[in-house]
Structure formats: structure tokens, C-alpha cells
Amino acid sequence: MVVIIAMKCVCIKPNNSFHIGECGYGIEQTGIFPHSDTIFSGICNCYAYIKGRDALENLIEKFFENPPFLISSALPMIFLNNNNIFFLPKPKVAPGNLDYELGKMFKSGEHISFSAFKKVTESSLRATIKDLKLLSKCIVTSDEYNLIKDKDFDYIKCDHKARNAIGRLTSKSSIYYCGISAFPKNWGFYFLFKGEDAWLKNIEPSLKLLSDEGLGGERSIGYGRFKFDIKEIDVPTAEDSVLMTLS
């Protein structure tokens, strides 16, 4: 059974590429979406800049007993005017109500839209290949596919950019490479906020500063900047014996 819960979310539209540092062999890799600890760290740094270190320490102390708010890791979304499509991580265990062809397609996806998640978790229905479509690495419903298919739809790409470092002692230059994630115009990401609206308003100035300062690494060359909007969305959750973590 799927239960719909209304939650606040922060929708982020990237202005340029992001560098979310991850371990790599020889080249620093990049993640596509920032995790919750990266987002929280960025908010805290900006919170301290605006309100001072003491205010930040008072805020952090609250999390040891009764956290005033919780945030999820970032998840992908597609901006389509008034028909934005939000995605969840694809369940690790495929639902048992999929037919054979859809089951094979399900393995190839990485994320699943809210509507598709609701469809495959309704145990009373048997989802077929006609109900869902695979668009790049995302599983969407047939209706969502029809909204997207005629648009310039490219999935988020990871690439490597050459950088130059100058030695402080020798003044010699050396080339190194870092990973970046490039967002096409229709793509962005969001994170969920669980807490009182007063706390969301309290950290909103920090989010505004963070959008100018940048989120993630390589901010000195302009990476990680974005625009954001706060919305209330209906999040599907399945009442079952398994759970899905969003952080």
C-alpha cells in the first residue's frame, strides 16, 4: 500500500557544473548528486558566516538530543514548467508485480519517478512494459515519457577537466585532472526537508548565500552555483516490510 506524505523540498537548478569529490585512482572522481552531509556542511558554513559561530554551535547542540530538522541526500529531478518530475532511488529489490520484460528493464534503471514508484508498489496491480518506460537511466510512466521524449533530453554527464597547479617554491606548473558533473538545461536535483517551517525559514538565508558561494568543490573557479526554490510536494511511501533510505 502506498501512502502519500506532504513534505517540503528544496529544488535546485544548477547554474553550471558541480564537483562532488569522491575517491579516484590518479584522478579525483566526482559524484553526480551531493549527499546529505555535504549539503548540511554547506548550510552550516553559511549559517556561521551570517549569524556567527556561537549561533552555529547552539544549532548543532540541538541535533544531539532532538534534531530540529532533517534533510535527505540530493535526488534528481526534471524541470518541465508546471509538470516537474521528481525521482527516487530505484528499489534494490524489484517488486513482485512486474512482468518479465518490465523486470529486465527495471534492472537497467538507477532512479524511478514518484508516479512510477507508486505504480510498481501497488501490489494489487501487475505492471507491464506498456505502463513504464526507461529514459536514459530513469524509469518513468508512459505519460511522463510522452512529456519528455520530444524535448532535448540528455542525462547528467560526468567528465574530467584539466587544471593547472603552480608550485609555491619552484613556480613550476603541473597538470592535474578533476571530475565534474554537467547538468543539461532540464535537469536539476532536490532534497527533502523534514521539520517545522520556522526552521526552514531560519536556514533560508544560508541557502541563499550557499547558492552564490557554491556547493561542493572547485568553487573558486565558479563550480557549484545554483538557483533554488522551496516547494511542498507529495512523496509516495510504501507501507511494507522493507525500507528505502534517502540519506
Predicted regions and their residues:
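Conserved active-site/ligand-binding neighborhood in enzyme cores
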Residues: 1-247
